[in-house]
Amino acid sequence: MIYPENIRKVGIITPAGRLAPELMESGIAALRKEGIKVDEPAPLPECKTAYLAGTPEDRAEQIEKLWLDPEIDMLLCSRGGFGCTQLLPLLNWRKLAKRNIPLAGFSDITALHWAMSARRAGTPVISPMLGKLSSIDEVTRCAIAGAFTGKERSTAVKMVAGNSFSGKILAGNLTVAACLAGGDYFPDSAGKVILLEDINEPVYKIDRCLTQLEQAGLFDRAEGVVFGSFSGSDPAELEELFNRFANRINKPVAAGFPYGHNLPLISFSFEDTITISDGKVVIAH
């Protein structure tokens, strides 16, 4: 089973870019093959902006409708791209906070996840999105259920600085997180382990985003930082940057965690605790 037995009906949301129809179909087929009921998204009205699935108002309305539907057990994002930050001031967070529902995705979904954390609404879950469900590898597949059940997941990382640290998780795409810095939807990071990933960014831009988050105070009271995948970035330059960054913040730092746009992807919830000790990672609820 991809998802645990308590996830019987999934609501598909498209909060950012539009998913290609063939990927929508293959993802829904993968869910139904597992015996999961799917609330298929009604086509959003045409949007003049090609890289968005619909207007901010229509996308926000779609989320609220499915979030508050008592028959829906989980919200699954169809894909990332760009657009989630546009929705944050449009969502009725007070109303959404009354129902604790998992919302699964990553990448641009960081904007929703961090706002959920800041407004204490729902449960952010990092896991594959609908468009990739039919093509995930076995390691990724086996790790998904643990994000909902709390079952222990383990892997290995490279220690950049320090030996051990532990805390609840705050994870996100680096570029999106930097966009939220200093705004109304920037979450409290006290006692958290910060997990960050990105894709196709030159190292100087990664440094710029890390500097912005550093100056916004994200790392001040955090327990440490774990870097996921940064595919498309120069590995040697990244290693140098991570070392300089660790010296700047004077916190434990690890790199190479399987989280990001590459496979495998280890799924987890913001309610999980992550423990890193001498390069070994254990995640459990």
What does each model-found stretch correspond to?
Residues 1-71:
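ATP/NTP phosphate-donor binding region
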Residues 19-23, 168-201:
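Conserved beta-alpha junction segments in alpha/beta enzyme cores
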Residues 69-74, 221-222:
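Short acidic/histidine-rich motifs immediately flanking catalytic phosphotransfer sites
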Residues 74-85, 106:
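N-terminal glycine-rich "phosphate-gripper" loop used for MgATP/nucleotide binding
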Residues 91-115, 123-129, 251-254:
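Short, acidic/small-residue loops that bind anionic groups at enzyme active sites
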Residues 121-182:
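Conserved anion/nucleotide-ligand pocket segment
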Residues 185-238:
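Internal helical hairpin/lid segments
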Residues 229-285:
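ATP/nucleoside-binding phosphotransfer catalytic cores, i.e., glycine-rich phosphate-binding loops
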